Amino acid sequence: MSVWLAWAIDSLRRSAWAPVLVFVFHIMAIIGFNIYSRFPEFDIPMHFVGGVAIAYFFGGCYQAAAKRELLGQPAAVMFPPMILGLTCLAAVVWEFAEFLVEQWFGIRTQPNLADTLLDLLMGLLGGAIWITWKHRRSA
């Protein structure tokens, strides 16, 4: 098995459960409870928790890669900006997905620019809090 495949499998086993759990909860809340129509503000904690989950996932990927020396010998100082940057990328991709759902299917997912920016902020805040917790725990 190639080292890259082993890394991918280890990363998925180690930490993919967190974003998958958040996504499944999100879908169940929509289908089962029509949650965002009933409580539009439910979107705010979901983006925060999503940021925590995706930072956890990228942190697990980073650690699995470091363990296999796929990143060389990364300095510990690189962990926070790399994970926060990847969390930011995931939040932006999610917002693009919401935009496409609205454009293609007519399902209102982004009421206005302020909502989109708050979603991005909450995702980044969730990621930053997880990174801070992880850093303090490992120090």
Predicted regions and their residues:
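Interfacial helix-loop-helix junctions of multi-pass membrane proteins
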Residues: 33-43, 92-124, 128
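"…centered on the first transmembrane helix and the immediately adjacent amphipathic helix/loop
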Residues: 1-60
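Generic hydrophobic alpha-helical membrane-segment signal
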Residues: 14, 31, 35, 79, ...
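Internal alpha-helical transmembrane segments of multi-pass membrane proteins
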Residues: 66-88
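Membrane-interfacial alpha-helical segments at the cytosolic side of multi-pass membrane proteins
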Residues: 49-66, 103-108, 124-137
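Alpha-helical transmembrane segments of multi-pass membrane proteins
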Residues: 22-30, 55-59, 86-98, 123, ...
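Residue-level signature of transmembrane alpha-helical entry/exit and packing/kink sites
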Residues: 15, 44, 75-83, 115, ...
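Short, flexible segments with low predicted structural confidence
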Residues: 16, 21, 71-72, 93
